[in-house]
Amino acid sequence: KDKNNKNKTLKSFNKSLFTNKIFQEKKFLMKNIHDKTYIFVNCIKSKTSLDYEKLGSNLYVFLKTNKIEQTFIEANTSPLTNVQLEKLLHGAQLKSYDFDIYKTDKSKTVITNLYVVGNKYKKNNLLRNKLNSLLEGIFLTRNLVSEPGNVLHPDEYAKRITKLRKYGLKVTVYDQKKLKKMSMNALLGVGQGSVRGSYLVTIEWNGTKNKSKPLGFVGKGVCFDTGGYSLKPAKFMEDMTYDMAGSATVVGLLKSLALRKAKINAVGVVGLVENMPGANAQRPGDIVKSYSGQTIEVLNT
């Protein structure tokens, strides 16, 4: 197409895709597809992995916004190395996440596929496995955090974590009966106003025979936090389903370690409760004895 049209296309493309200051135009390749001109620009200012992931993320947004269902990156003419291409694809995959399982109308969803072609491109299986393992863990975390409180209550959450056993993780679930015997009263107190159970779940990954102490990760898993009798304002109540994001991060992390067969030992611990007002709920001023034997006066539930 004529020079003026190319400049117009490039200007439009830069506005929609390259809004971050870390990007700096260096060279671009234009392809004409069905009378539409698309540009792929190599515009990395600094050569860190995160920059290429951000480029992939922005590229995915551009493709989806313009309803481009299939895109091919020709590796033989691309200035990016195989590792850089892997990072770009990883960024696009992360951006493709969409929690839409409860949407009634999915017909408007545009599936965007991004391909790398050319004999120059050789898949790095080690890096790809690492990135895919990371992706699986991140998506699990996002799925758990995105679930509404009426679906992902402590009972359901504990069940979902047990499904990680198929990846070689050792999962142990301590229910209310066991927690009472262990004198885990501080944890039980938070959830005693709910009709749901309260749980402590440990997730262990043994990736090496080394007897050194494992890495430990602890995550808060309040599936919904009304504040109990110290009730939270209605304005902020709907966001209290995210009060379990810490535990979801731990769960996703352990899955990633298992999938990549990480050569470390690690253990994750998550407490799963629902903080609700009720006839049996914990009151401000209550005193409980914790697992350590320390007594705690509850001033705010």
What are these regions (language model features)?
Residues 46-54, 240, 244, 298-301:
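Active-site pocket-shaping loop/turn-to-helix segments
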Residues 262-301:
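A glycine- and small/hydrophobic-rich beta-loop-beta segment
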Residues 86-94, 191-194, 232-241, 283-290:
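A glycine- and small-aliphatic-rich helix-loop capping segment at beta-alpha/alpha-beta transitions
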Residues 161, 215-217, 230-274:
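Alpha-helical metal-binding/catalytic segments enriched in His/Glu/Asp
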Residues 1-214, 218-221:
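Short amphipathic alpha-helical segment within the helicase RecA-like ATPase core
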Residues 35-40, 139-142, 213-216, 223, ...:
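Glycine/charged-rich beta-loop-alpha catalytic/anionic-binding loops adjacent to active sites
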Residues 83-87, 156, 182-186, 227-235, ...:
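Short acidic, glycine/serine/threonine-rich loops at helix termini
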Residues 174, 218-220, 227, 269-271, ...:
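Generic beta-strand/beta-sheet core signal
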